[in-house]
C-alpha cells in the first residue's frame, strides 16, 4: 500500500509542481538533528535573508526534519516529509527528490528521519564556501560562508555541547557565527523543534517554533527568545497546577519561570499568588510589592482573581496585599 501511495505522490508532485516552485536565494547555515533520547526532531537556521524561518525548516513529529536552502526549492520540505512518513529513509527520499530536480546543482538540502538516518546534498554550483558535515543524528550545512571552516565548527559544537536539543542546536549556530558565518552578514533566524511523542496534531506536537524575521543580531535574539520560551513553559505549567489547586507544584513552576525571565513582572506575580494561596503571606507580600511597583495594573487585577477562584484568600489578606 505504501508503494502505491508513494508512486501516486511522485506522479502528482513532479507533474504538477516541478515548474511552479518558488526558487529563492537563501544562502545560509543550518542544522537538522534528532535527540535520540527524547525523539525530538529539530531544525535551526540563520541567514542574511528576510524571514528564513518561513522557507528553510520543515519538521514533523515522529517523521523527520529537513532544511532546504541555497537557491531554495521549498518543495523539498513538504515533499520530503511525505516520503519519509510513507516509509522511506532520509537517504532514499533525498535521492528521489534530487533526481527529479533539474537544478539540483544550486540546491543545498539536509534530511534526517525518526530513525536517525541522515542525508545531505550540496550542489556543485552552490556559492563558496559551501559544504556539509553529517554526523550521528545530525547534519550541518552552509553556503556563501566567509570561511570554509563553518560546517566543521558547527559539527564540533553540536557534538560537544551538553544540553537539550535546543541548547545543542543553538551552540551550532553560535559556532557558525564565530567562524564568520554568512559572508553577507546576518538578518533572520529560526528554530523549530517537534515532540518525540507525536499525537498527529501539529500544534500539540510543536515544542518550539521561534522565528526572528529581521534583526541586526538574529542569533543573539533567538537565544534570548529561547530563554523566554523556557520561562513560559514553566509559567504554563504553573497555571495548570494553580487551576488544579496543586499549590506546591505551582510555586515550583512559577519560581523557575521567574528565574528564566526576571525582567517580566507578571511571572513573579503568579508566584506571589501561589504563595498567598498556600497561606505563605509573609513570603508573598514583598513579591506583590515589587510587582505592583513595576506594573500597577497587576494590582488592579488582583481582586478579580478571587471571583474566579485563582486567589483563595479572605478580605483581610486581600487588604494586606492591596496595601503593598
Regions found by a protein language model. Give the residues of each.
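Register position in tetratricopeptide repeats
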Residues: 243, 277-278, 311
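Alpha/propeptide regions of enzymes that mature by internal proteolysis
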Residues: 18-184, 191, 213-244, 259
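Canonical tetratricopeptide repeat
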Residues: 236, 270, 304-305
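Short coil turns that delineate tetratricopeptide repeat
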Residues: 262, 296-297
Amino acid at each position: 500500500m505504501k508503494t502505491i501511495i508513494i508512486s501516486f505522490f511522485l506522479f502528482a508532485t513532479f507533474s504538477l509542481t516541478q515548474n511552479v516552485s518558488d526558487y529563492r536565494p537563501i544562502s545560509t547555515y543550518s542544522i537538522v538533528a534528532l535527540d535520540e533520547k527524547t525523539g525530538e526532531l529539530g531544525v535551526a537556521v540563520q541567514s542574511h535573508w528576510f524571514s528564513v524561518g518561513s522557507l528553510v525548516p520543515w519538521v514533523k513529529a515522529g517523521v523527520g526534519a529537513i532544511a532546504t536552502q541555497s537557491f531554495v526549492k521549498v518543495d523539498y520540505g513538504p515533499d520530503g516529509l511525505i516520503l519519509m512518513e510513507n516509509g522511506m529513509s532520509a537517504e532514499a527520499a533525498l535521492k528521489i527528490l534530487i533526481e527529479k530536480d533539474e537544478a539540483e546543482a544550486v540546491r543545498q538540502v539536509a534530511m534526517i528521519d525518526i530513525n536517525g538516518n541522515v542525508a545531505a546534498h550540496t550542489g556543485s554550483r552552490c556559492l563558496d564556501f559551501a559544504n556539509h558535515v553529517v554526523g550521528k543524528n545530525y547534519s550541518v550545512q552552509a553556503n556563501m560562508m566567509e570561511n570554509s571552516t563553518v560546517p566543521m565548527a558547527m559539527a564540533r559544537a553540536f557534538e560537544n555541547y551538553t544540553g537539550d536539543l535546543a541548547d545543542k542546536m543553538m551552540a551550532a549556530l553560535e559556532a557558525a557565527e564565530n567562524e564568520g558565518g554568512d559572508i553577507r552578514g546576518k538578518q533572520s533566524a529560526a528554530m523549530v523543534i517537534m515532540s518525540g511523542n507525536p499525537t498527529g496534531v501539529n500544534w500539540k506536537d510543536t515544542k518550539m517554533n521561534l522565528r526572528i524575521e529581521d534583526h541586526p543580531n538574529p542569533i543573539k535574539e533567538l537565544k534570548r527568545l529561547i530563554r523566554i520560551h523556557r520561562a513560559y513553559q514553566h509559567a504554563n505549567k504553573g497555571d495548570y497546577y494553580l487551576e488544579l489547586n496543586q499549590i506546591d507544584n505551582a510555586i515550583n513552576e512559577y519560581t523557575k519561570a521567574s528565574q528564566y525571565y526576571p525582567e517580566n513582572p507578571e511571572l513573579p506575580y503568579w508566584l506571589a499568588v501561589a504563595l498567598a494561596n498556600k497561606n505563605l503571606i509573609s513570603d508573598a507580600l514583598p513579591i506583590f510589592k515589587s510587582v505592583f511597583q513595576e506594573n500597577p495594573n497587576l494590582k488592579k487585577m488582583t481582586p478579580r482573581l478571587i471571583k474566579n477562584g485563582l486567589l483563595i484568600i479572605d478580605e483581610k489578606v486581600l487588604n494586606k496585599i492591596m496595601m503593598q
